[in-house]
A protein has these predicted regions:
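Short, aromatic-rich amphipathic segments at membrane interfaces
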Residues: 113-154
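Long, solvent-exposed extracytoplasmic domains/loops
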Residues: 47-126
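Hydrophobic membrane-insertion alpha-helices, especially the h-region
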Residues: 10-26
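Residues that form generic nucleotide/phosphate-binding pockets
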Residues: 41, 81, 85, 131, ...
Length: 194
């Protein structure tokens, strides 16, 4: 390999190494920032799973018994398996829009008030459920960023290894001299080319 080609390869490896290292750092930062934001936004809300089934904890959430909701995974479980279950029971299988329409259509003020109370509870519950699922969504994005950061770091290490190899080859002087000049009669000719 000629010296000029080796220098080009080394420069490209340095550029690739810098790009991959920056990408890895940015991905790790995105993971850390997102995870911290999720925790810092959920902590002040003081949302916690019930201690046990007697307090309303569904059986499939027993691993979270008594824990405060601080992670995206916990937020998703709380939103879907706890709030979702209770909203389904409160709304008797119907969504907020159904109960809101029932309240507006009711001619009896007592029935209208009862239906509106159900609609209000469903609205608040669905709003909280949506917010908790947003935290979970961002936690998934944070996990993807972590995986990308690791992949970029591994790729950067591979490029660094090849860069070290190229520099070592250059230092030991294993370049070839590029022959310049017309072809000699002993060199093979390509078929059809004179």
């Amino acid at each position: 390999m000629t010296r000029s080609i080796r220098w080009r390869i080394i420069v490209l490896q340095i550029v690739a190494l810098l790009v991959l290292a920056f990408g890895s750092g940015a991905a790790f930062f995105a993971n850390s920032f997102t995870t911290t934001q999720i925790h810092d936004q959920l902590a002040p809300q003081q949302i916690a799973f019930p201690q046990n089934a007697a307090q309303g904890l569904p059986k499939d959430l027993s691993q979270y018994a008594g824990q405060q909701v601080l992670t995206g995974e916990q937020a998703h479980a709380y939103a879907e398996q706890y709030i979702g279950l209770h909203l389904s029971e409160i709304g008797q299988g119907h969504p907020y829009s159904y109960w809101s329409a029932q309240a507006r259509a009711a001619t009896d003020p007592t029935v209208a008030a009862k239906d509106q109370a159900i609609a209000d509870t469903l609205f608040k519950g669905e709003t909280l459920r949506s917010m908790l699922n947003q935290a979970w969504t961002f936690s998934v994005i944070a996990e993807i960023a972590l995986i990308a950061g690791i992949a970029f770091a591994v790729a950067a290490l591979i490029v660094l290894g090849t860069l070290i190899f190229e520099v070592a080859e250059m230092v030991t002087g294993k370049e070839t001299v590029e022959a310049v000049g017309p072809a000699t009669a002993s060199e093979p000719k390509l078929a059809g080319i004179q």
